[in-house]
């Protein structure tokens, strides 16, 4: 009996050991299987990672479509069930589920079924939490039935739980996978949408920029293919009285007429009477009766016969000498000889002016004749509504007076349907030196390319430096040069005075100047009532400051400068010109030194001295016009040696005796010239440095390019050869740079990973972008780089935005190297914005905001260029 008990116990021990061994083997197999599955999963992930981006995108799209279809089907089923379901149907479902479980466990399983049914959606939404299932419960019941003792082995229970975890991990709800796929798809779609949005914004920016560029682009005209009609240039028949003059008589007459100097071949002899010109009676009535001009002035005596003979001329004469009438009379005779304008044809006479005020002055002079002669003239300039100008041109204007910028806008508007220059045969450039000095050379060249080559071109100015003379000869064919009274000479009718202030503190010097100005104004107002005073200053801010001071001293006055709107400038000139306005003082920058002709202007005060002598001549030339007397007073300090030298030179050239010039001025002049000889200073005069070539680096690069192309010849030995095919003059052997070399850089918004090399220090960011803004219009650039715009973008995107590079004019090629302090270094690139950020997303957001600002700025620039026309015609 005892042996049987021991045998049974040994067998039970053996069976337990076998069971344990068997379970351990099962556990090892399970672990091996799990490791193998994990390796297979890693391989699948690696294979998926190596797939191309295109395959991923296609797979995403397919999955997205499948998910959408399945989602749509589920929503339909859910909607149907929500409508049709009832408590009876719910009970029948529960009964069917309950029937699959044994009867003794029905009460328990019903509860579990109900619990599982209620939490089904939650299990889908929260897959991390393990939920009990009916399958696991039935397995537990089977284990209990297999065990005869009804006991549950701990190891069996552990292995069963592991198998359940494995099965649950393999059986992840499909809804969770689909949700993950949907998230990936949504991320991909959002990236695609962002790329599409950036692409659309870039296309919009490009189109607006191109549209703004095209507004000022003129079509290239091949004049050799155009069928131009012939026209007459020569309207002058020399009277027999003049034909009988000998050469000595002609020279003496020219000497009497303020020393006229002429250069060129076959120069006509000067005239002394209006009748010598052979003008029609209608012209003579206006000249002698209405305008009361008794005889031609010096410039008119020589220029009128030369222009009426059909010659191109360069006329240089002092201010107020009647240059305007010298080109107006031949132009009217020229137009009257040609057929009337037809619909769609442009003007016959074209007059270009560097400033708006001068254009208005010329137009006013022309209207004295056009009203009686049945002609029409149109004045076009920027800063005023364009619709009225378009309306006048549409009606047909035989004479067009304007500034180069606005004329180009009108020519380019509506693809050239507003007006054209095919009928133009007479061209005038008034104040031509200032035209080139202000950087209008590209615009003038553009306009001249639209005009037939054999047209007659006339240039007039009060000064004509050698540099500008060479540029002007490109536009003329075999021109005559007529110089009256010398170049850059103040008229003898003007009394020149200088107020010298010794060097001191700036505030003290300013107080002394203002006190002296008040004394002069008080004395002048007593001696010359209702006379006008024009005060010149150097800067716009100085004009506004002086206005406040004079108003505080009970001196009514107005200001005019480039920073004011056109309507304000026009109002200021109108009030100043009126006798009864009560405003007898006008403060201005050098913008009023050209074309301002006000009757009763007896005093000009240079509160700040001009920076060169030519500007001085034009400033003081606003008084003493048409033979009247005038006074010019210039304020200068002893440390302004260059200005003092110019003043002494101007007075000397005006034939003022040296003993009448203050000795202190001559002393300062001599000291300065000694410094120039010693090489301490460089003394130059004339216009220059305010136009397109104002940057030293650009001047150096231009000079080096010219040396390579033209050779090291001196400017004085340059020979000009007329090119009859295009009406321009070229240097021997000159070759022009192709236009393609000067390209317009559109802004690029590419984000680059890594630190920008142009920044330094520990704060370098991980992503950066360079946005070129050099070639944007000035208004658009200001819109982007102004402090408010950049600060908002920096705050909202947490990026760093810095201005880099240097501004280059659109037609200027960036040099490779520049000379700084005698050393050559790489030239700075075109102006751009450097955007830096810690993340790629922040840089992209900043780029997007900058792009929006650019688009907004281009829209504003386009509106301002057209002045928002509201009339019948629009650009």
UniProtKB/Swiss-Prot annotation:
One of its GO terms (molecular function) is RNA helicase activity. The keyword Coiled coil applies. A motif (DEAD box) lies at residues 430-433. It comes from Scheffersomyces stipitis (strain ATCC 58785 / CBS 6054 / NBRC 10063 / NRRL Y-11545). Disulfide bonds: none annotated. The Q motif is unique to and characteristic of the DEAD box family of RNA helicases and controls ATP binding and hydrolysis. It comes from the Eukaryota. Residues 1-92, 108-177 are annotated as: Disordered. Belongs to the DEAD box helicase family. DDX46/PRP5 subfamily. InterPro entries: DEAD/DEAH_box_helicase_dom, Helicase_ATP-bd, Helicase_C-like, P-loop_NTPase, RNA-helicase_DEAD-box_CS, RNA_helicase_DEAD_Q_motif. This is Pre-mRNA-processing ATP-dependent RNA helicase PRP5. GO terms for cellular component: nucleus. Keywords: ATP-binding, Coiled coil, Helicase, Hydrolase, mRNA processing, mRNA splicing, Nucleotide-binding, Nucleus. It is found in: Nucleus. It catalyses: ATP + H2O = ADP + phosphate + H(+). ATP binds at residues 317-324. Residues 519-669 form the Helicase C-terminal domain. Residues 177-217 form a coiled coil. PANTHER family: ATP-DEPENDENT RNA HELICASE DBP3 (PTHR47958). A motif (Q motif) lies at residues 272-301.
